Amino acid sequence: MIDLITQLIRPDIRALSAYHVPDPAGLIKLDAMENPYGWPDTLKAEWLEGMHDLALNRYPDPQGTAVQAALRQAMGIPSDMGLLLGNGSDELIQMLAIAVAQPGRKVLSLDPGFVMYRMIACFAGMDYVGVPLRSDDFSIDLPVMLDAIEREQPALIYLAYPNNPTGNRFDSDDMVRIIEAAPGLVIVD
């Protein structure tokens, strides 16, 4: 069986470690955008009531038409601007990487940063380039970042905002400079 796995699974995938989430017991967990409190009973009841009318035996609308309309209205998004919906950021990160993946293309992000950027780049067969944040305050070292963009010519740049795991927000002027210098897509996650 080991020989079969070695033959079938790419070496770069075999070398990956599972994405480990430590037990949060006794900690204040701020990194996963989770509500540390339960939903109020009134909100739970309202949510469950809304489930009565759903066709749970059918796949949902793949375009999320109603969700897109609500987002456009709430956020003032023009109708000619596309929206891409997904089942959490991991799926969207993966969809974008797969969409641009070709031999030799690169994903660039900041380190330390969200571990899924590196992992999904590997899944998609892309090279990952991590650019270190400043060690004193975890801010973007803009000259180093711009040099990496020029040298590596990434197809995709991910910027977690606020950064995960450091929690800091990056200087908006630095982010604009990165977007202007990028030869490919820049995703602010």
From Swiss-Prot:
Family membership: Belongs to the class-II pyridoxal-phosphate-dependent aminotransferase family. Histidinol-phosphate aminotransferase subfamily.
Lineage top rank: taxon: Bacteria
CDD domains named among the record's database cross-references: AAT_like (cd00609)
Molecular-function annotations in GO: histidinol-phosphate transaminase activity; pyridoxal phosphate binding
Species, as recorded: Thiocapsa roseopersicina
Record bears the keyword Magnesium: no
Keyword Protein biosynthesis appears in the UniProt entry: no
Record's protein name: Histidinol-phosphate aminotransferase
Known catalytic reactions: L-histidinol phosphate + 2-oxoglutarate = 3-(imidazol-4-yl)-2-oxopropyl phosphate + L-glutamate
Annotated Gene3D superfamilies: Aspartate Aminotransferase, domain 1 (3.90.1150.10), Type I PLP-dependent aspartate aminotransferase-like (Major domain) (3.40.640.10)
UniProt xrefs under SUPFAM superfamilies: PLP-dependent transferases (SSF53383)
Cofactor dependency: pyridoxal 5'-phosphate
GO biological process, one term: L-histidine biosynthetic process
Major enzyme class: transferase
Listed pathway(s): Amino-acid biosynthesis; L-histidine biosynthesis; L-histidine from 5-phospho-alpha-D-ribose 1-diphosphate: step 7/9
InterPro entries referenced in this protein's UniProt entry, alphabetically: Aminotransferase_I/II_large (IPR004839), PyrdxlP-dep_Trfase (IPR015424), PyrdxlP-dep_Trfase_major (IPR015421), PyrdxlP-dep_Trfase_small (IPR015422)
Pfam families registered for this protein in UniProt: Aminotran_1_2
Subunit and partners: Homodimer.
Gene this protein is translated from: hisC
PANTHER family: HISTIDINOL-PHOSPHATE AMINOTRANSFERASE (PTHR42885:SF2), HISTIDINOL-PHOSPHATE AMINOTRANSFERASE-RELATED (PTHR42885)
EC number assigned by the record: 2.6.1.9
Keywords carried by this UniProt record: Amino-acid biosynthesis, Aminotransferase, Histidine biosynthesis, Pyridoxal phosphate, Transferase
